[in-house]
């Protein structure tokens, strides 16, 4: 007898989920910046995934730090798509994992990462509120506040912890 995989998982106490974004695309008019694709047809896909047993979904938005980026347009475009995705998930009975990720590539300092992540989280939560997303019904998957991989000065773990905690406390309702 063939047992659906999701049923097997449920019997083991495992709740299945699925990544629903369709990767990143170039943000038109904004060189070196990306937006996440996948909102087209998402309602239909979520209904199908729910029927198949998925109870959570993941959507990742990437924000790059570099010369004059991220732009306000990039932050808003990604926050907007995260909020629309989260709203659609909740309407479908699926818990959204909201992942606004400020990338660690580059040479930026921990202070720059902190500044950008604070802006990003503030705008993401404004957009989630605008789309009537029940915040208690999401899982936030944020980045840590860290120095970029190629930054000549790497912050110690205490500074990473302190700035990450302060950023989350300041911006997450």
Which role fits each region the language model picked out?
Residues 59, 98, 140:
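Conserved, mostly hydrophobic/aromatic
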Residues 49, 86-89, 128, 168:
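Hydrophobic pocket-lining residues that define ligand/cofactor binding sites across diverse proteins
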Residues 108-173:
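Active-site capping/gating regions of soluble enzymes
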Residues 1-52, 65, 153, 157, ...:
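Alpha/beta catalytic barrel-like cores
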